[in-house]
Amino acid sequence: MEKVHLLCNAHLDPAWLWPWNDGLAEAISTFRVAADFCEQYDNFIFNHNEAVLYEWVEEHDPALFERIKTLVKKGNWRIMGGWYLQPDCVMTSGESLLSQISLGREYFKEKFGIVPTTAINFDPFGHSRGLAQILSKTGFDSYIIMRPAKFAGNFIWRGLDDSEIPVCCIYGSYNSLKGKALEKIKYIIEQHPEEKILLNLWGVGNHGGGPSRIDIENINEYIKNNDLKIIHSAAEDYFADVDTSSLPVVEEDLVPFAVGCYTSMVRIKQAHRRLENKIALAEKAMCYAEMVSDLKIDTEELKKAKKALAFCQFHDILPGSGIKKVEEDGLKCLNYGEEIVDRLYMKAFLKLAEGQKKANDGEIPILVFNPHPFEVEEELEVEFLLQNQNWTEDEWTIATVYDEKGNIVASQHEKTASSLNLDWVKKICFKAKLAPSSVNRFNCTLKQVKEKDLPSYQYGEDFISVKNERMTAIINRKTGLIEKYTVGGINRLVNAGKIEVYKDNEDPWGMTVSSFTDYLGDFTLMSDAAANEFAGYPEENYKSVRVIEDGDVRTTVEALFEYKRSVAVVQYSIPKNGTYIDINITLFSNEVNRMIKYNLSTAEGGEPCGETAFGISSYKNNNCDDEVVFQKWCGFKNEKGDVYVLNRGTYGGSFNEKDIKISLLRTPVYSGHPIHERDIAPHNRYLNHIDMGERHFSFRIVADQNVQNKALIFNEQPQVISFFPSGEGEKFGSIVTLDNNEVVLSSFKKTVNGYEVVLHNFANHNNSAELYIKPLDKRINLNFGKYELKILKF
């Protein structure tokens, strides 16, 4: 061993076993103590990352902030990492990881003139392989992590696109106990004599603290009396001494750790995805509107929403390992961001709607914004109100929907969001073909129809079947399950849709497990009597599997299941002319310390895989039933026929030979942390358990090879509203188009100097594409390597 770099830090979780305001107070206290020691000990260096903490100090203690700026110039205080905070790095999308970097970089460059080149994520519970490319493309030359411990040491991390970044997975922990730092430093040195250059972290952490006087003086005395070269140091200085030329190469996601966190606190995860989606969609709408109208993008308001999202991606909020108050605050924060983005989007939409002609008499216009740079064909929903309430008992108002050219499109009426039993509020579902990146126009005309003349559809006693030229979907009325799902003549699902219950414990992290396999039983179909009792109408005689919506567009089947004290309402929505099945589950969860999975049994199985940050993770080398993490989709790739499950905020699951098991929810206690042989939580009282009560889940089963764009549409849905335009202004057609469906337009953003577009090749081979931006008359021809990410600025 030639040299030891001591990196003093104060790991400070903004929220975890304490709420954010406690974290704010501790940040100020910790930074003040660290500044004192930096001023008192000339050789001492304090390192800290996370822009959000510096923002808090700047706002609430500006004098301390000025001291820190002076210490940064002197070199005693080093800005570390440069991100907004340490986010979860497996569930956070590639686009959000870019945002974490840009928010932090913008802040540190503006306030300190510093751009760190070593990224830091000590505490997150794993790292997507897509991050290797993200770091390389954003100017980082190295990365320091702590988990999973099986990767401890230095290595080259090779991304999906073959980009490479040196990584140090630290030995031991990022922190030390007060007065015990030297003891820890000595231990790490003794345990790893093989290391030529060693990185050793110390400082009281988790709830802040950082350096202490006794630790600094003990360490300085040790340095003075030791022949080994030991220095107070920083991340970049450590990597400057490391010879990376012969390091081993790692070509995989850096997982698993805390696999329960892929599922704990589903409401946080769903709200997180919803805000991710809305920011992406709103930014596209705002940029498109700015290019074709007088709209000025409110970048400061948008940044508030982005910071709300970034904060809730923190590695104890998004993973669900915080206390109940942290969950509640996280939901408030995400809702705050969503409210901002909804208003910004609506402003942009109204600008994009300019130039639409006024509606004719008796016509109700429907406007649909397609944010995507390609044509979308989708079943859409819209609600509007009749001009007058219709109080005629046996008569209903029916709409006919036309496209812009006057062609009738398939449509049907469905139950509205309200339960007002009056012909006034109307909900229409219609099949639409949408031009790229533009507002599309549809029109409705109305007529009154006698109730006896409304169409009716008949289904068999044992099965409910929906068939078209490409797909067959059959729901079994005796089981409530998907009996068969066939696309292109190939059977994809068989007896699928069981809701399975597994024994779990109080630990929301799932720290001590890699899978959940202690099977306890299935939810079973309710009897008809029990289903009517649950619905609140015991005197009725409806079936527990029944058609609740039907028409020319789709059939929706509802099935009710039960398990002990819990109930599941499953709705299958099957298009009359599509090739997918939408599944919406309302789960009333009342079992503690359980994992609940949704098992989709396939006909053939295949290679299990799922979306990761700007790429695809393969799980073929995992053990059977290992818990895995994915983003917008997962499924089986198979030459005989693929099958994938799209989601809107579900991140965990497992695979065996033929089953896709989506992890719906877990019910551990809040922040129940395993400690050696102790009980995880006290047994002498009632404890709050996570995800008890009503929860909602949304999935789409597809058999398409172009799964990435399908998942994008399912998450960033075309936006529909009934709106009567003025007829004024200039109508603009498709604003942005992209001619290769394997290349994904991830974002279109406003920057200080123009626009930024993020695209990535979602294929394991080279690709090319043309991006056309019509208002700027700009054609950009692009060549991509496999899984390559491109960030264009103009």
Predicted regions and their residues:
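CE4/NodB-like, metal-dependent polysaccharide N-deacetylase domain
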Residues: L97-G130, I134-K137, I185-L201
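Alpha-amylase-like alpha-glycosidases and glucanotransferases acting on alpha-linked glucans and related
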Residues: G153-N200, V204
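Terminal accessory/anchoring regions of large secretory-pathway or extracellular enzymes
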Residues: A25, A35-C38, N220-I230, D237-F794
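N-terminal catalytic cores of secreted or lumenal carbohydrate-active enzymes
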Residues: M1-Q100, Y107-K111, K137-D141, L254, ...
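C-terminal domain-boundary segment and adjacent tail
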Residues: C8, F46-E55, S136, A149, ...
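Surface-exposed loop and adjacent secondary-structure segments within mature catalytic domains
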Residues: R67-K74, E95, S128-N175
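Conserved, mostly hydrophobic/aromatic
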Residues: N9, G104, L135, A234, ...
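Alpha-helical scaffold elements lining the catalytic groove of polysaccharide deacetylases
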Residues: C89-Y107, Y171-E190, T555
